[in-house]
Regions:
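Short, surface-exposed coil-to-beta transition loops
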Residues: 1-5, 18-19, 84-86
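Short, solvent-exposed aromatic-acidic interface loops
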Residues: 18-32
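Low-complexity intrinsically disordered segments
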Residues: 39-134
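Extracellular/luminal recognition modules and glycoprotein regions
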Residues: 3, 28-37, 48
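Short beta-strand scaffold segments in enzyme catalytic cores
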Residues: 4-9, 90
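Short acidic-glycine loop/turn motifs at beta-strand connectors
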Residues: 10-17, 92-96
């Protein structure tokens, strides 16, 4: 039981099974994933230039947000629970969702995008040294 998802970064000239990926046991709904990706982009985290770095920083953002010591996994696409019976896989390019796999249900729409961004930032701005520009 969970609200599982995998976020994978689409990589050029690399087989999909080897794409850098992040497993979420909780908070895998699109209404949380899109704000997480937005915050990564806001912080200037490089996505396509170095996908392993991108996944590491995204996992830091997620970990700071959900807290605790469980519920995250990092690996390649083939290593993670992609057909997880919850939210499936979000295929990401430049921090935008460009494809979706193994999602068969209704889209979760419980959280407001801007409120979620604010909540994620409240746990990460200081860590990432981010200040809003006027």
């Amino acid at each position: 039981m969970g609200n599982r998802a995998v976020i994978t970064i689409k990589e050029k000239n690399i087989p999909q099974e080897d794409w850098q990926s992040l497993y979420l046991h909780w908070n895998g709904g699109r209404d949380t994933v899109e704000p997480l990706l937005h915050v990564a982009k806001l912080y200037g985290v490089r996505c396509q230039d170095d996908p392993s770095y991108a996944i590491a920083r995204l996992s830091q953002i997620v970990g700071n947000f959900i807290q605790g010591t469980t519920s995250l996994g990092v690996g390649t696409y083939k290593q993670l629970d992609t057909d997880n019976a919850d939210n499936g896989v979000y295929v990401v390019k430049d921090w935008e969702i460009v494809d979706r796999e193994y999602h068969h249900g209704l889209e979760q729409q419980e959280y407001d995008f801007n409120e979620m961004v604010s909540e994620i930032r409240s746990k990460n701005d200081q860590v990432f040294g981010y200040e809003e520009q006027d």
